[in-house]
Every structure is written in structure tokens, then in C-alpha cells.
Design a protein with these regions (language model features):
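Cofactor-binding loop segments of dinucleotide-utilizing enzymes, especially the Rossmann-like FAD-
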Residues: 9-10, 149
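Glycine-rich beta-alpha loop elements in corrinoid/cobalamin-binding modules
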Residues: 61, 77-207
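Conserved Radical SAM active-site core
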Residues: 1, 13, 38-39, 46-51, ...
């Protein structure tokens, strides 16, 4: 099957950290006392995939975007970074999410200051995206959309937006807006360079899609937002929404059934 929308990220994101989430924190630092290959194997090993490169688990946030697109009737799937090249001929867009694109968030930035070295997550992402760009040089119509918790970081590196051919940066909860962007891509319409999802435009509880396939290590969310409303925090500025027990049960049953 051909997919119009390939959702992906680098190896530090598409991994289950040997079924130990806390090993994932090693990707926020540079390799210390060990060769980088061993450090990466410990913190971000390759994950099992099917014959077309779909990982058996994927980050929960990417699963939500995948589910939103699938529920809306779009041809979308998450693909392991090592298999993206197999889908470039049919894809209309590559959609990328990340927790810390350029090691500007904690604890990556602290490790960077302490060691004066680039953390593994930022290094892996740079190599990952450079590899993609080199493979799509002749595919001028292929769009690249970036988002996720670290989308704000692109605002601090505007030169890289042009270097890496980024068409749209989506900052905020993306389930609603990603469907609009996907339709624009299929229609051949112009895309906005940057979208800031206002808290008032965040999806309501009944607009949040339930994941279709397992998340990394079975992690799910049971609520969004925060009642505090702190101005300095992107989470607390969003409306609070508690998942119903039925929603939680459905996602847990899916993960158990497909494990």
C-alpha cells in the first residue's frame, strides 16, 4: 500500500529503549565514557518493524497524529527512519515530531553546557534530516512538516528551516490542524510557514483520536492541560481535559491485544 503521509522521527525517538523508558534519558547527553555506538545501542536500539518498515511501537504523540489522519480518511502511517527511502516515491509529505530537535530543552541543554559537546538526540536528528534531504533533492513537491513538543525550537534556528526545506512548523496540539494541512497538500494549495495553535483551538475531548497501534512501552495519556495557567508553561496554558475511563480502557486494550 502506498501512503501519502509518512510520519517519522530519528532513532532516538523511534525506539523502546530496551523496554526501559529511563534509558531514553541517555539520548539527551553526549556519549560519556563509552564509544558513541555503544551509547546509542544502550539508549536507542533499533525497534522491530514489519516488512514495509512500520515499527511495532512508536511515540504516543506520533500515534495520535497518525490516528487523527487515519480517522479522517487520509493514507498515513508511521515509518521507521531506516525505511523512509522505500516510501519517498509515493509520499506527498513527511511529518516529523520530536521532543528536543536541537538540544535546547532540559536536560539536553545542561549536558551541552557541561560537556561542550552535542547531545546524541540533536546529533541523530541532524544526521537523520540531512539524509532525507539528500534523498529528496529532485522531489520538489514533497513537503516536510514538523511539530511536536519541541516545535518552538525551530523559531530559534530560522536558517535551518530553509536549509532543511521545512514547509510548515506546527506549534501546539496538532490533531485538528494536521488534517487541514494534509488536505491542503493533497489539493496542491500553498502552506503556511508557521502555525501557532492557540489554546482555545486545542481539540476538545471528543476530537482527540484514540491510537490505532501500540505506543512506546505502552505509555498513554489520561489527561491534557493543567488548571494552574502559568504563563511561562506551554502545558498549563492549555485547557484541562480528562480522558474518560472508556477512552483509557480502549487504548490499553489495544496495546495489550497488539503487544
Amino acid at each position: 500500500m502506498n501512503y501519502d503521509f509518512i510520519i517519522t522521527s530519528d532513532r532516538t525517538m523511534i525506539t523502546n529503549h530496551h523496554n526501559n523508558e529511563f534509558l531514553g534519558f541517555m539520548t539527551t547527553a553526549p556519549a560519556i565514557g563509552l564509544p558513541e555506538l555503544i551509547w546509542k545501542w544502550i539508549s536507542a536500539p533499533k525497534i522491530k518493524v514489519d516488512k514495509i518498515g512500520r515499527p511495532i511501537q512508536a511515540p504516543y504523540g506520533l500515534r495520535k497524529i497518525e490516528a487523527a489522519l487515519l480517522d479522517a480518511g487520509f493514507k498515513a502511517t508511521i515509518i521507521d527512519p531506516d525505511y523512509i527511502h522505500k516510501h519517498l516515491d509515493s509520499a506527498k509529505a513527511i511529518m516529523i515530531g520530536h521532543h528536543d530537535y536541537f538540544a535546547l530543552a532540559s536536560p539536553s541543554c545542561e549536558w551541552k553546557m557541561l560537556t561542550n559537546k552535542e547531545p546524541i538526540n540533536a546529533k541523530c536528528f541532524r544526521k537523520f534530516l540531512t539524509k532525507i534531504i539528500n534523498k529528496i533533492k529532485d522531489k520538489k513537491d514533497l513537503k516536510i512538516i514538523v511539530g511536536g513538543p519541541a516545535a518552538w525550537q525551530w523559531l530559534y534556528v530560522p536558517k535551518l528551516i530553509k536549509k532543511y526545506r521545512i514547509n510548515t512548523v506546527i506549534n501546539g496540539e496538532g490533531e485538528k490542524v494536521i488534517k487541514i494541512i494534509a488536505q491542503k497538500i493533497l489539493n496542491g494549495e500553498a502552506l503556511p510557514n508557521y502555525i501557532e495553535v492557540d489554546p482555545s483551538d486545542s481539540p476538545k475531548l471528543n476530537e482527540i483520536a484514540l491510537i490505532r497501534y501500540p505506543s512506546i512501552n505502552g505509555l498513554i495519556e489520561i489527561m491534557r492541560g493543567c488548571p494552574r495557567g502559568c504563563k511561562f508553561c506551554s502545558v498549563t496554558s492549555r485547557p484541562i481535559r480528562f480522558y474518560t475511563l472508556e477512552m483509557i480502557e480502549k487504548e490499553l486494550k489495544l496495546i495489550i491485544h497488539m503487544a
